[in-house]
Amino acid sequence: MNLHEYQAKSLFQQYGIPVPKGVMINDLADLDAALGQIDSKGWVVKAQIHAGARGKAGGVKLVETAEEAEQAASELLGSSLATIQTAGKALPINALLIEQTLDIYQEFYLSLMVDRVTKTHTFVISAAGGMDIELVAEASPEKILSVHVDPTVGLMPYQCREIAFALGLTGTAFKQMASVMQGFYQLALDKDVSLLEINPLVLTAENELVALDAKVNIDSNALYRQPGLVEMRDISQEDVREAKAADHQLNYIALDGNIGCMVNGAGLAMATMDLIKLNGGEPANFLDVGGGATPERVAEAFKLILSSSDVQSILVNIFGGIVRCDLIADGIIQAVQEVGLTIPVVVRLEGTNVTLGKEKLANSGLSIITADGLADAAEKVVAVALEANQ
């Protein structure tokens, strides 16, 4: 789960990470009061969406007067913004962050993530802040520093000092780097964070470090023990279908193809999509109904798939271990009848009660294509999708 910048900075403040003075508004009527709370020679008006690269897309505006601030806020609030990180989709701007301006001397990059290779929390630091870190890593890998935190002892003071020395920090900023890194690490542990990022972390003319931007991603699997963070969720920034799927305990990710997929198990779902691609097709989604699939959840899964007008055929691939194939068949029949399905459905069932499941499908009177194996199912669903295109 992603947080907005203003939410992330609120967490930063709780952990002693310095941020600019700022006020979030979601109504233009609150703008004057917000400006009055920020003693600054100018302001920054920042669109709040779940994406980076907002500045390049016109979502961050530097203003010097209240009139300019009002114009910028009027243009942004209530509109939508697409960046290079939104895959062509414009996200709604329902809130703005109004911040003070700073005299910036130098910009750094700082992030903390879970490294699956070393199985540690890992800091990534660079003196080349304010840029896409991927581009820096590609063009100048020597500018990227990393620090792996041993989970048995935690972040050590000497590791913070090494980074401060490497960045050439002195005085107040040198000491601040240690507190920022310690705050980062504790925040990640306390809040089940999968990614923390400041880009840029700026060194001001007063030799102080300030988090000019903030990005926080929370491990969605841990939200059950983070009720305070759940309240920060902004569904308007999410794909409507993915949000609805989560409400029904379905794992759904929208893709760009025309072949809908319904599978139980993430690994089997990925293998199914691979075979569709191998046969020349394009999956329209990833959808894992899970091991405890019920007829009701299967029906909801069908509705999710069909919510995309691009879908021209559907492949249902179920291996009945925990879930019984006859129950899946009931769900398929129920869903087809409920939604009045008009596109081809290819079904591959294997496992517990598979014979009974196939009998139910055969006796349903519905136009459902059965397959004898996964390879056969992939071939058939791609073929019927191609026919629908002609």
Curated annotation (Swiss-Prot):
From the Swiss-Prot or TrEMBL record, give the protein name.
Succinate--CoA ligase [ADP-forming] subunit beta
Q: Which cofactor does it need?
A: Mg(2+)
Q: Where is the signal peptide?
A: none
Chain positions recorded as ATP binding sites = K46, E99, L102, E107
- Matches recorded under SUPFAM superfamilies: Glutathione synthetase ATP-binding domain-like, Succinyl-CoA synthetase domains
The residues that hold Mg(2+) are N199, D213
Q: List, in alphabetical order, the GO biological process terms annotated in this UniProt record.
A: succinyl-CoA metabolic process; tricarboxylic acid cycle
**Family note:** Belongs to the succinate/malate CoA ligase beta subunit family.
Phylogenetic lineage: Bacteria, Pseudomonadati, Pseudomonadota, Gammaproteobacteria, Thiotrichales
Annotated metabolic or biological route of this protein: Carbohydrate metabolism; tricarboxylic acid cycle; succinate from succinyl-CoA (ligase route): step 1/1
**Assembly and interactions?**
Heterotetramer of two alpha and two beta subunits.
Q: Give the species this sequence originates from.
A: Hydrogenovibrio crunogenus (strain DSM 25203 / XCL-2)
Q: Where does substrate bind?
A: N264, G321, I322, V323
E.C. number, please? 6.2.1.5
Using the record's annotation, list all stretches that form the ATP-grasp domain: 9-244
> Superkingdom, according to UniProt?
Bacteria
> Could you tell me the keywords of this UniProt record?
ATP-binding, Ligase, Magnesium, Metal-binding, Nucleotide-binding, Tricarboxylic acid cycle
List the catalysed reactions.
succinate + ATP + CoA = succinyl-CoA + ADP + phosphate; GTP + succinate + CoA = succinyl-CoA + GDP + phosphate
